Design a protein with these regions (language model features):
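Charged, compositionally biased N-terminal leader segments and the immediate start
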Residues: 1-33
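Short terminal or interdomain "cap/linker" segment that borders an active site or interface and mediates
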Residues: 4-5, 114-132, 137, 141, ...
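Generic solvent-exposed, charged/amphipathic alpha-helical segments
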Residues: 10, 14, 101, 145-152
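Long amphipathic alpha-helical segments
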Residues: 21-22, 26-59
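Amphipathic interaction/junction segments at domain boundaries or subunit interfaces
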Residues: 47-141, 165
Length: 186
């Protein structure tokens, strides 16, 4: 994955737990990289090893780390570096989710070697939809939950996410039931 992913994990850890913990996590993961370059590709293993080591060093489950990382990705990483792209993708949570299927094709204009996830929306109703997530990468279901929670916070829209189907349990791909209520008045 592009270095910006590993950089974002570093940012999350350093902001919340300090630079010493980040050094300990890199050492435990056996990752010998001083500075991750956003535009450079790194093996996916580096990212998985960092999450595994963070779980051990911080005494948190990998699930909680991936959820926190998903929220951080939306609320800090994406907002700071790519705010206009986020804004262009929708003015409300449901609008943003309906446009999610084409979102990473715009990201791929900046990151040409991107291997993006694929999303689609079905059963779209007032306040509810099924969001389908396809990826060749295993183990990122909780990252998606965190991303969706982050989007809810970004739009000030209370959101509930329930996992309806899991690839890790034999389904074709992960499916989330996403329910939202009216955005809080600004
Ligand atoms: C401007 C905002 C965003 C940027 C710049 C961005 C960029 C990226 C990049 C660079 C990767 C790594 C993939 C690779 O290197 O091959 C990635 C992965 C991913 N992105 Fe985004 N992304 C953004 C927003 C989002 C949003 C809003 C969602 C969903 C709600 C999302 C879902 C994912 C997922 C699930 C992955 C993990 C890869 C996988 O599942 O295979 N991203 N994204």
């Amino acid at each position: 994955m592009y270095g910006m992913v590993n950089k974002a994990i570093e940012d999350l850890v350093v902001k919340n737990f300090g630079p010493e913990k980040w050094s300990a996590i890199k050492e435990k993961a056996g990752v010998d990289v001083d500075v991750f370059l956003s535009n450079e590709g790194y093996p996916d293993k580096v990212t998985y090893d960092l999450v595994g080591a963070a779980s051990e060093v911080l005494g948190m489950s990998a699930r909680d780390i991936l959820i926190a990382f998903g929220e951080h990705w939306v609320l800090h990483t994406a907002r700071q570096g790519y705010g206009s792209m986020l804004e262009a993708n929708g003015r409300t949570l449901p609008e943003f989710l309906l446009n999610l299927p084409s979102f990473h094709s715009r990201v791929a204009m900046i990151f040409p070697d991107l291997q993006p996830p694929r999303f689609s929306c079905t059963d779209v109703k007032d306040g509810e939809m099924m969001l389908h997530y396809h990826s060749h990468r295993p183990g990122l279901t909780d990252f998606v939950v965190g991303l969706l929670q982050g989007l809810g916070k970004m739009f000030g829209t209370p959101v509930e996410i329930a996992v309806a189907e899991l690839k890790s349990e034999g389904a074709d791909h992960d499916v989330f039931q996403v329910r939202w209520s009216q955005a809080a008045p600004a």
